[in-house]
Amino acid sequence: MNTISQKSYAKINLNLNVVGKTKNLHKLQSIVSLISLYDEISLRQIDSRKHKILFKGKFSKTINSRNTIYKTLSILDKEKLLKKKYLVMVKKNIPVKSGMGGGSMNAATLIKIFMKNKIIKINKKKLQKINDSIGQDVKLGFSKNIMYLDGNNSVKILNKKTKYFLLLFMPKYVCSTKYIFSKVKKYSKPLKNIKNKFNNLGSLKNDLQDIVIKKIQS
């Protein structure tokens, strides 16, 4: 097969409320959008006993071997969905540990490549199970529209085709998502009709912001 390439877009939380926690996951309310910053993923079949994964680019140096691409391929193999082995090449343009879901979006993009080219065939229920096995944010990579998380781990689509300008700053500091959520001690009161708040984003907040600032200043 020829090499197949696809863009893997970053996501951004335009607000984020931590409204509670289940046994394993925090419950989030958030308006989420994909943005024009993207990684580039290429895939081709290889004659090998194992899959091969190659990262390159400015933000590739700190990615470990147990990354989301590795995890995705391992799960698809375990489910006996892949009959061949593949070389996956990822050019990293999305900063690592930036909160923009680079790893999760890469996993989603890889699955979409497999599905689009009929390498794997899975129904919606199976896809949801696989996505959740990889990571909580993977499902966000399957929509081009602005989305919102309703606080119960469900993704809803906002029926808005809105263009907006976004200015991104890349600080010198990194802070892992796992660490940030481990420091959440208080929960916000759930917002009503969060999907109607899009036109007034200035009134919303990010519950994780103060935790990150405190970490940087310590």
Language-model segment annotations:
Residues 70-85, 112, 202-218:
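A short, flexible low-complexity segment enriched in Lys/Arg and Gly/Pro that occurs
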Residues 1-98, 115-125, 170:
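ATP-binding N-lobe of GHMP and related small-molecule kinases
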Residues 98-127, 140-142:
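DPxDG-like acidic metal-binding loop motif
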